[in-house]
Amino acid sequence: MTRKEKKELIWRKLDNSAKIFPLSSSRKYSSVFRLSAVMKENISPKLLEKAVNNALNKFEFFKVRLKKGFFWYYFEYNDKKVVIEEEKDYPCKYIDPNTNNDYLFKVTYFERKINIDIFHSLTDGNSAIQFFKEIVYQYIEIEYAKEFKDKLRTDRKFNFNAEDSYLKNYNKKVKNNTKSKKAYILKGRKIPFDAIR
């Protein structure tokens, strides 16, 4: 990463749809979603860590931590080591920044399965899928380099630009003029909920 790129990554604001998640998230309501992939063989933690670091080099916008400013939350560049650990908690659990080196995603493994839990302020599902696919691809490339030497793709293209999709897709001129039909109302006599017929 060049010095200029690193400077641009020092901080950036949350996009419009991501602003609600830091305010509404808690240990009870995590705002975390999960992606998983099941491999043919048990996962090697060291290789998985290397794969995640390789993927992070391509997806720099995932190398951030969430900070609270005076008026709003923002992302700040995070160069700490990514924590990779064996899965021991339930899926989509609140990501505690203190145990995860402040990253907004958590990579775990269990036997043959690779998981990534992602805090929704960091990204939407599409970017998360692209990032996760890159992790899995990097893992396969490292683990099976000799077997797949001539079969691995080197022409993969990425769009590395962060965008606020809400601003890109929102059109305030479009009004919701659709009229919905009334719901069908059942007729007849109500029976008690616990009645057996």
Task: Explain the meaning of each model-derived region.
Residues 1-42, 187-197:
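N-terminal beta-alpha "docking/capping" segments at the starts of catalytic domains
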Residues 35-197:
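Soluble acyl-CoA-dependent acyltransferase catalytic core bearing the H(X)4D motif
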